[in-house]
């Protein structure tokens, strides 16, 4: 009986550890990947940067990408 209880507790501990580790290791998005629906999922050295899309002065949407922190992107003509 003690062996069954001990085995159950050990299995419970192992499953809990696996679940906690999976949460800590959530998949992060690499550079230039779209993060519109998941702004917090960019890799640690990246930030989710969003830009509005406009057509004839009216906003038609928003795009977000994982970009390097501290880097300023400028439009080229």
Curated annotation (Swiss-Prot):
Domain of life the protein comes from: Eukaryota
InterPro entries: Spider_toxin_CSTX_knottin
Gene Ontology CC terms, in alphabetical order: extracellular region
Tissue-specificity statement: Expressed by the venom gland.
Main location: secreted
The keyword Metal-binding appears for this protein: no
Subcellular locations according to the entry: Secreted
GO molecular function: toxin activity
Prosequence residues removed at maturation: 21-26
Modification after translation: Contains 4 disulfide bonds.
Keyword vocabulary terms for this entry: Disulfide bond, Secreted, Signal, Toxin
The keyword Disulfide bond is annotated on this UniProt entry: yes
Similarity comment text for this entry: Belongs to the neurotoxin 19 (CSTX) family. 08 (U8-Lctx) subfamily.
Protein name (Swiss-Prot/TrEMBL): U8-lycotoxin-Ls1c
